Amino acid sequence: MPLGGHFYTAANKVRATCLVNTATHEIIDAQIGSTDQGELTLASQLSPCSHSITLFDRAYFSADFLIGWQKCAEESHWLMRAKDNLRYEIVKRNSQHDFHIRMPISTRAKKLNPALGDYWEARLIEVEQAGKIRRYITSLIDSKRYPLLALAKLYAQRWEIEMCY
């Protein structure tokens, strides 16, 4: 039926989230759901590989999700750009632009999952790229084993994910 001069058809819509190897573009795992399911809901059903680093965009920043991600598989880590309004306190300064941080867990998150506690920890790094300071947050706490420039370079591979669709 025309509506405002346009024809509309009923079409099923779905939301998908995939775990992709950025080197090979191979889809490792995928979840498909209705559009009323959020990306975090679908992503929490993915199975990360052991001894892996998953690159997320900022939409996946959630204490409950990221803590859970690390528990899904042995040495399953994550790396993402830090939000501009990130609330944290410095636990340890590894270098001028590399920090072990502690972040408060929101009241809402604690209500949904009381096992989370009051705080969670991660690593915050700052890297200058094209004249701008970029901040990244990661579960890879060991600054000697995972140098900050190597992590920033690794995150640049996140755009390879877009080549899979």
Task: Write out the residue ranges for each language-model feature.
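Single, function-defining residue in the core of a domain
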Residues: 3-165
